[in-house]
Amino acid sequence: MNQSISITPVLEEPTHQDTAVAKLFIKQLIILFLEMLLALPLGLLLAKFYTGGIVWIFGGIAAGTLVLQGCRLFYQYSPKPNRTARKVGMAFVGLTIGSSIHGNLTSVASGIPIFIFLTLFLLLCGGCIGYIYSRMSQTNLLTAMLATVPGGVGIMAAIAADYNRNVPLVALVQAIRVTTVVLTIPFIARTSVGNYWNPQTLPVKSALLNLDLSQLKLLLLVLLVTGLVVYLAILFKIPAGDFFGALLIGIGFNSLLNCLPFVGDIHFSPPPLINVLGQMLLGITIGEYWGDKPTFGKQTLGYALMSVAMTLAAGAIAAILAMQLTSWDWLTCLLVTAPGGSAEMILVSLALNHNVEIVTTGHLVRLIAINSSLPLWLFLFRRFDSQSELS
């Protein structure tokens, strides 16, 4: 009996999912490139009217809003805010701030109880404001709390999506709060210090050309180490890992290098371009949340503005308490207790060269406390929600 065996090759089906992911990644890169390209002239234009070290954040906010709105209006394409760009921006800013801290953060360790008290006060106020907002807007308590507790636009919106809550509303209130703080506090600081404002606006020409080739290898090394540390911090879910990890690298990089026996006396500082890019990315991601907003009614916007106003009032009360409990001046207290925009507020203190160590420690304590306590907050909010539904 003759038997013939035929072997049919098994053809792998094309991975449409991988192709879609690649296309999405390319679209995100193109959008980010356009935003950066637009943020440059906007930052330069703002620098003509506003002398300060964080104009690139404002340029990024405008660029992110305009580009995403343009995608929606002209191409009927609604890209989501780029959270990866936010992480990279936080890492760049953390690296810049860390390398600029000449003092020792342990010198302000005695103030940690004050920082913890102020953080708990702001969290308690955020909970009360969230309850009031939920009653006014007739929304569930979990959505209201996620919208009003200072914890970052991206983080709170992502949690709202995980629990099937009103993501656009959470992002709206958080974006209003962060934008208001980021735009208002620098102008208050500039007005208060007057001629003592340190004009650290970073010209593009200086940022691009002020690259010391002898330190280019060190720049690549520090970026590689920062990327590794930030990746591990995010992987192990360390609170505010992208900012905190880069900050530690910025503080300790020179000391670690000088401890090596085969390395001489080295003092490395990241070039201004890193600061410019970090500020742009922070601003762009804030602006993207504005460009991504659907249409809200006047009543919804009114309630959102009321909750933000209450949050700002709570921050002002916390600043007054800090003035009574410490020897800090009022500007330091204002920067420490500003409800949101931690990296941006530290940048303001850096531009002013005003108690950078105190402001940095205060915001780090708050970031760690808020992110570490999120599971407890979520448990309580969901429990209160279920009880209210039963009643």
Predicted feature residues:
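Structural signature of hydrophobic alpha-helical transmembrane segments
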Residues: F49-T65, A85-G89, G111-L122, A144-T148, ...
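C-terminal transmembrane helix pair
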Residues: V182-P186, L312-S391
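Entry/N-cap segments of selected transmembrane alpha helices
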Residues: L32-P41, V88, S99-Y131, L219, ...
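Core mid-bundle transmembrane helix pairs that form the ion/substrate translocation pathway
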Residues: L40-P41, W197-L260
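Intrinsically disordered, low-complexity non-transmembrane regions of multi-pass membrane transporters
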Residues: M1-L38, R72-L73, S78, G194-L216, ...
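Flexible hinge motifs at transmembrane-helix junctions and intramembrane kinks/re-entrant loops
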Residues: G43-A62, L66, G70-T84, Y231-G245, ...
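Hydrophobic transmembrane alpha-helices of secondary-active transporters
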Residues: G60-L73, P79-A109, I249-C259, P271-G297
